[in-house]
Amino acid sequence: MTTRGFEPERAGGEGELPLLRSRLIAPPFVHGFSTRAGGVSAAPYDTLNLGARWGDVVTSVEENRLRLLRAVGVQGPLYVARQVHGAEVVRVRAGDAPAGIARMEADALITGDPGVTLGVFVADCIPAVVVDPRTGAVAAAHAGWRGTVAGVLPAVVRALAAEFGARPGDLRVTLGPAIGACCFEVGPEVVREFETALSGAADAEGVVMPSPRGVPGKWHVDLKAANRVLLARAGVAPDAIDAMPDCTCHDAARFFSYRRDRETGQLMGIVARRPA
């Protein structure tokens, strides 16, 4: 799988917070995917842990979130999806939360309002951001394997069309850092789920592959490739889908990974449209 143009940057008031951005997404849209660098948390959450659910010091997490928002160039409130590992999409409107961070029970958030910042927490699952240059709508989605086979990203495409009149061919989608096929080993029950979700897709070859180590009853799955297939099936142009190639599980120096460490921090992907 190729990448269309992810680039690491040093940005924001802290000056030392690396972000990953896609060249597909241009102003007035802003977005970014965090790494584990640039924060204040102590091990095993070192250093830019953005999730408060797994045991880190709350004040450290709050400082890390402020640093991320400054680096991306946005302000609160920050609306984040409290993932349910499905395909639930929720629309967010300006004023739904007065300040701070607002958690919504969903796997994806969409908005048509400028100045509304959407985000998702991950630690191996795919953080996806979607922008529509024609309507100005944006979305942030969490796509783990369950959300992938449930069709969370096609559900986002449909929701953007229903709520804002978005056309799939106008959308630009960026898939941030996530577990790669090198490390995502699964059993036959998960393989069957992917085979069902991708049935009839002519370009699904290479999504599921035998264990490279020859482990009986085990396969490896390429989550990003699976979501490319599903997005293309939903009408998104293949050259409007960007995907970071790095694996969160393999690259311990740069990324948190639940599969690798269990006790770990969380990364974020965030997106917004700046007011005119």
Please report, for each region that a protein language model flagged, where it lies by residue.
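Active-site microenvironment for binding and transforming phosphate-containing groups
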Residues: 1-276
